[in-house]
Amino acid sequence: MTTPKTLVQAAVDVNDLGLGKEIAVMAKECGADLIEVGTPLIFENGHKAIGEIKKAVGDTPVLADFKFFLTMGLAEQAAAEGADYITMLTGYNEFLIEDAIKRCADNHIIPVFYPFSKPEELCALTARMISLGATHFFNHRYAPMGDPSGQDNLAIYRSLSPEIHVTITSDVFSEAVDSARSGADCICFGRAIHTPDREACVKWIDAIHEAR
């Protein structure tokens, strides 16, 4: 898809709901395009965490990061709490992929797929998922993670289709900015804002927005 400006997904990866809301509001005020309700927040507080974060950030889109395999009912639960996107792990199961796409469409929520595969299988798995209707993907830039000499996952996604939306997650500042320059549609970061650090939040968001 290659958006004109790389979007920024701010991940709220804390356990405490009050702190999570504070971080989410800060990220919105600093210019984040998307707020991620992180896995720790959901696990600690249940699905209500999604709704509480959505109320706190208003019209800013919210992603529910379940980090589960495609499980029946997740789309309905996330949508009921106001999520706009949902992250799901996925492997080679065409029925579950097609079912997730349909359930998300029925509930007006966009599935973002995190392929669970060996690095050498990523290309084939993603190509199959695209053929089944998947449009949004999430992954680390490199495999092994953080190793630029390894497989460039972003390059694989971009080679498969210019139409898919690719989010790269990275808590390494230089890697995040380079991924934005290299064609990622969205960059997800979170470690820098585990505490409400407005200066760090602005630094990350502005650098990613200005990378292209």
Question: Which role does the model predict for each range below?
Answer:
Residues A100-C104, A180-R181, F189-R212:
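C-terminal helical cap(s) of enzyme catalytic domains, especially alpha/beta-barrels
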Residues M72-G73, Q77-E163:
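Conserved anion-binding
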Residues T6-V12, I35-V37, V62-F66, I86-M88, ...:
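Hydrophobic faces of well-ordered beta-strands that scaffold small-molecule active sites
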Residues M1-A64, F68-M72, R128-I130, V202:
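Conserved N-terminal beta1-alpha1 strand-loop-helix module at the mouth
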Residues K21-V25, H47-G51, A75, I97-I101, ...:
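Generic structural signal for well-ordered alpha-helices
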Residues V14-L19, T39-N45, F68-T71, N93-F95, ...:
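Short, small-residue-enriched loops and turns at beta-alpha junctions
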Residues I23, F69-E81, E120-S131, V166, ...:
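Catalytic cores of alpha/beta
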